[in-house]
């Protein structure tokens, strides 16, 4: 009957709903596309089809559908948040924030707006703004939507605090994520590596890093954390073994940090030439990352300076550290800049 009477839009809408509930995405898509052929301005069909395209990772198509909805009806509030979410997945944080600002101009503040804004600011390495928005999101959720405050939410908040060098607060928040989800190994590794990286609380770092490795033993980032923990503990042979295993796990996508760590371990074992080779690999990878950098990244620039300094290129190291310091002035960076100036 529907094939003979394509104008029966209500029937098609009901069928699309039934197919979606039965996880028959292809059949639902056919019905929604048929509705849009008959009535291209059907907001609901466009919105639902945008969600399907998003779930299929067809992000450009999803964004186009949500944008069309908003052109047809600027008061269609959920479309703003769906579009903002797609822009986040596309790694377009500035466009995410622009979409959220339009929503803010018309609607009351809500959790998802502030949460997405926090994630977007984190992507732009604007960590104080990220923290501000995530805390507002938490406050809004506590008042009306407490189920939104998941382990993932607190992981994002904890990571923002860590990136802003507020380590004690990051520690508290990341532990909260783990309390909510006791096997959330991503947060365990993040917390453990944070302490190992700044060479503090190594016993606690060991607890979390070892547990993360038990839960996901083939995760290269976790193996790197284990190797770096051994390095901080002065176990340089054990460190090298784990770090080389991490590099093997990442052989198809080499990681600058892993190769820098391997170089550090080799240097401690008296293998200066091999260390230099690893640092050069790390440097090459970092320079590639720098070329792709769309917004200033203090962490990347600091690491670049570290590797350049290890390779004896103090002038370039200082320039990179200076750029990092201008983005996020920290005491460790100030000391590095001062030590290089003293050597000269």
Residue spans for each PLM region:
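Structural marker of alpha-solenoid helical repeat scaffolds
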Residues: 4, 38, 72, 105-107, ...
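Residue-level recognition of tetratricopeptide repeat
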Residues: 17, 51, 85, 119, ...
């Amino acid at each position: 009957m529907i094939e003979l009477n394509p104008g029966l839009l209500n029937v098609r809408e009901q069928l699309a709903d039934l197919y979606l509930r039965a996880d028959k995405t292809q059949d639902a898509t056919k019905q929604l596309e048929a509705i849009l052929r008959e009535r291209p301005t059907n907001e609901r069909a466009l919105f639902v089809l945008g969600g399907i395209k998003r779930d299929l990772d067809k992000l450009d198509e999803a964004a186009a559908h949500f944008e069309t909805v908003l052109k047809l009806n600027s008061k269609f509030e959920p479309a703003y948040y769906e579009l903002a979410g797609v822009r986040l997945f596309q790694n377009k944080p500035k466009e995410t924030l622009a979409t959220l600002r339009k929503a803010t101009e018309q609607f009351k503040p809500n959790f998802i707006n502030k949460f997405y804004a926090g994630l977007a600011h984190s992507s732009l390495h604007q960590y104080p703004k990220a923290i501000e928005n995530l805390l507002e999101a938490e406050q809004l959720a506590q008042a009306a939507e407490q189920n939104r405050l998941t382990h993932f939410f607190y992981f994002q908040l904890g990571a923002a605090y860590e990136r802003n060098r507020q380590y004690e607060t990051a520690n508290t928040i990341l532990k909260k994520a783990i309390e909510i989800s006791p096997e959330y190994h991503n947060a365990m590794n993040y917390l453990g590596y944070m302490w190992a990286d700044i060479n503090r609380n190594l016993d606690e770092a060991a607890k979390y890093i070892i547990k993360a490795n038990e839960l996901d033993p083939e995760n290269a980032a976790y193996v790197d954390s284990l190797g770096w923990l051994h390095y901080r503990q002065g176990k340089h042979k054990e460190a090298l073994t784990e770090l080389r295993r991490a590099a093997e796990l990442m052989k198809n996508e080499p990681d600058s940090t892993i190769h820098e760590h391997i170089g550090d371990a080799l240097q401690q074992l008296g293998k200066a030439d091999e260390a230099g080779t690893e640092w050069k690999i790390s440097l090459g990878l970092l320079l590639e990352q720098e070329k792709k950098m769309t917004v200033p990244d203090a962490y990347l620039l600091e690491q670049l300076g570290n590797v350049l300094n290890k390779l004896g290129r103090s002038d370039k190291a200082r320039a990179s550290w200076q750029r990092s310091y201008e983005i996020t002035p920290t005491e460790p960076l100030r000391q590095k800049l001062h030590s290089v100036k003293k050597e000269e």
